[in-house]
Amino acid sequence: MPLNKSNIREYKLVVVGGGGVGKSALTIQLTQSHFVDEYDPTIEDSYRKQVVIDDEVSILDILDTAGQEEYSAMREQYMRNGEGFLLVYSITSKSSLDELMTYYQQILRVKDTDYVPIVVVGNKSDLENEKQVSYQDGLNMAKQMNAPFLETSAKQAINVEEAFYTLARLVRDEGGKYNKTLTENDNSKQTSQDTKGSGANSVPRNSGGHRKMSNAANGKNVNSSTTVVNARNASIESKTGLAGNQATNGKTQTDRTNIDNSTGQAGQANAQSANTVNNRVNNNSKAGQVSNAKQARKQQAAPGGNTSEASKSGSGGCCIIS
């Protein structure tokens, strides 16, 4: 099958790093097969090279960027357009390694994603006597970025092709895998939205540590809810006890009132009974007095009665003269 532009995959690769770490030397060694010894600060250079990667003809479109801070305003534009990034530091400069994290975070922010094809490169491996950064330090930095790591020498052409080819493979392979991951995440988000609000049946979208945290948070909510419920129950019990005490006090007061009323009524009844007895005594006394008076009058009237009888006899026409 004849080659044409439509059959050739093109990779847009960007070389990023601090000033003087050998970005241009690596790019020129790859594209022109020679080493540039003198340092000429780059503003921005673009290189193209046709290569064969895994039996596939490809074109590497490489952007060599400026490492100086005064050109930092240009970074976002090439970060936005790049597909893969070669993050380069010099093994003779510890600060150049530390700078890589700043570039990495800026790339993620500009690309608005949590994955970008990246290869971390420790250049100038031929200057072993001036080494400030160990292989392990470089590897640890690459692990933080979830990226492959290589030490290279642009001067001796060590691992130069391998660094660029590895980056192209990441763009080719991880790009498709990453798109698949995005699709799966979108489906997972939709499933999460569908199950949202289903209470205990809801399952967190993420697993592992996120699930554990969700459970811990749920446990915290449960304890909090239990505390609130207990507080409410305590409040209800307190109010119920208060009402009970008030009812008891009310009943006691009512009983006392009833007792007082009963006592008063009994007193009144006793008083009335006493009055009745007194009245009866008085009546009896009066009756006795009347009876005695009548008896006395009868006794007094007895002699007078005989005289009267005699008078009645004399008045019948018979008169006795003494």
Swiss-Prot record:
Its lineage opens with:
Eukaryota, Fungi, Dikarya, Ascomycota, Saccharomycotina
Cross-link for Glycyl lysine isopeptide (Lys-Gly) (interchain with G-Cter in ubiquitin), residue positions:
K131
Q: Which InterPro entries match?
A: P-loop_NTPase, Small_GTP-bd, Small_GTPase, Small_GTPase_Ras-type
Q: How does it sit in the membrane?
A: Lipid-anchor
Which residues are part of the propeptide segment?
320-322
Q: Which organism is it from?
A: Saccharomyces cerevisiae (strain ATCC 204508 / S288c) (Baker's yeast)
- Phosphoserine modification sites are S198, S202, S207, S214, S235, S238
Taken from the UniProt record, the cysteine pairs bridged by disulfide bonds within this chain are none
> Miscellaneous notes for this chain?
RAS2 is necessary for a normal response to nutrient limitations, in general, disruption of the RAS2 locus results in an overall premature starvation response. Present with 19800 molecules/cell in log phase SD medium.
Compositional bias (Low complexity): 261-284
Q: A single GO BP annotation from the record?
A: regulation of cytoplasmic mRNA processing body assembly
Q: At which residues does the record annotate a lipid attachment of kind S-palmitoyl cysteine?
A: C318
Regulation of protein activity: Alternates between an inactive form bound to GDP and an active form bound to GTP. Activated by guanine nucleotide-exchange factor (GEF) CDC25 and inactivated by GTPase-activating proteins (GAPs) IRA1 and IRA2.
**Top-level taxonomic group:** Eukaryota
What protein does this entry describe?
Ras-like protein 2
Record keyword Membrane present: yes
Known EC number: 3.6.5.2
